Amino acid sequence: MNTPVIGVLALQGDVREHLIALAAADAVAREVRRPEELAEVDGLVIPGGESTTISKLAHLFGMMEPLRARVRGGMPVYGTCAGMIMLADKILDPRSGQETIGGIDMIVRRNAFGRQNESFEATVDVKGVGGDPVEGVFIRAPWVESVGAEAEVLAEHGGHIVAVRQGNALATSFHPELTGDHRVHGLFVDMVRANRTPESL
């Protein structure tokens, strides 16, 4: 049985919606708040919320270093909105004391779309997701200013990069979990499934 166990970092943000989307994409989904829970999952989703708050809570719960270690070790990880910011190697406009987990060689701008439009929906063509374009919900969303050579741009909107993949790390500016379209989560579940060693099956 090749059903991956995927955690959702449950420190802040729309955790429940991600749990539902992952289950719909044929994964076993569970909340992760502590290092011992992180150790038990095959992959992790970092949900939207407020990136500064997530950073502070990750430190408070003793999660920041275990998260960095697992991501460096190749654990598949998917970040949406604030989660995208957490996976960036660099933030263009960080708040004081704000730290990231890193994992994707990209520079992000926090709340970039929010300056123009607090929240909106838009269709986005995402590389690797078949069929119709994905309906993306952007809520005070970041965008990616630039990516390094190792990072692959999967989608753009309005001339800005909104989805990126580097190895086992995936990030989107938008919230696919809020639309009922679970294809982006399906892409991530496939990434997790492909990463699992035969011994772990």
From Swiss-Prot:
Q: Which residues form the active site?
A: 81 (nucleophile), 175 (charge relay system), 177 (charge relay system)
Pfam families from the entry? SNO
GO biological process terms on file: glutamine catabolic process; pyridoxal phosphate biosynthetic process; pyridoxine metabolic process
Q: Which residues form the signal peptide?
A: none
* Binding residues for L-glutamine: 49-51, 110, 139-140
Identify the CDD domains for this entry. Answer: GATase1_PB
Catalysed reaction(s) here are: aldehydo-D-ribose 5-phosphate + D-glyceraldehyde 3-phosphate + L-glutamine = pyridoxal 5'-phosphate + L-glutamate + phosphate + 3 H2O + H(+); L-glutamine + H2O = L-glutamate + NH4(+)
Its keywords, alphabetically, are: Glutamine amidotransferase, Hydrolase, Lyase, Pyridoxal phosphate
Example of a GO cellular component annotation carried by this entry: glutaminase complex
The protein's Enzyme Commission number:
4.3.3.6, 3.5.1.2
Listed pathway(s): Cofactor biosynthesis; pyridoxal 5'-phosphate biosynthesis
> Which InterPro entries does the record associate with it?
Class_I_gatase-like, PdxT/SNO, PdxT/SNO_CS
| One GO MF term attached to the UniProt entry | glutaminase activity
Q: How does it assemble?
A: In the presence of PdxS, forms a dodecamer of heterodimers. Only shows activity in the heterodimer.
Which family does the record claim for this protein?
Answer: Belongs to the glutaminase PdxT/SNO family.
Q: What does this protein do?
A: Catalyzes the hydrolysis of glutamine to glutamate and ammonia as part of the biosynthesis of pyridoxal 5'-phosphate. The resulting ammonia molecule is channeled to the active site of PdxS.
| Annotated protein name in UniProt | Pyridoxal 5'-phosphate synthase subunit PdxT
